[in-house]
């Protein structure tokens, strides 16, 4: 009976540790996506002025000579 109890406790600790690791990976991915979305809310779309403080949105490049975002 003691051996069965030890095996059960060991198995439950392994399952809990695996679940916790997956939970942290999900949180890290969510934080990364939130930061990416935050950056895109401060960006300049195509045809708008781009600066050091307001870079072009994803998919656009800043023409530093004229300071305009373009494809």
From Swiss-Prot:
Subcellular localization, as worded in the UniProt entry: Secreted
Propeptide: 18-41
Signal peptide: 1-17
Disulfide bonds: 43-57, 50-62, 56-69
CC terms in the record's Gene Ontology section: extracellular region
Tissue/organ expression: Expressed by the venom duct.
Gene Ontology MF: a single term: toxin activity
Chief site of localization: secreted
Keyword Lyase attributed: no
One family name in Pfam for this protein: Conotoxin
KW Signal (keyword) present: yes
Domain of life of the source: Eukaryota
Keyword annotations: Disulfide bond, Knottin, Secreted, Signal, Toxin
Recorded family membership: Belongs to the conotoxin O1 superfamily.
Domain statement: The presence of a 'disulfide through disulfide knot' structurally defines this protein as a knottin.
Protein name: Conotoxin LvVIB
Organism: Conus lividus (Livid cone)
Species lineage: Eukaryota, Metazoa, Spiralia, Lophotrochozoa, Mollusca
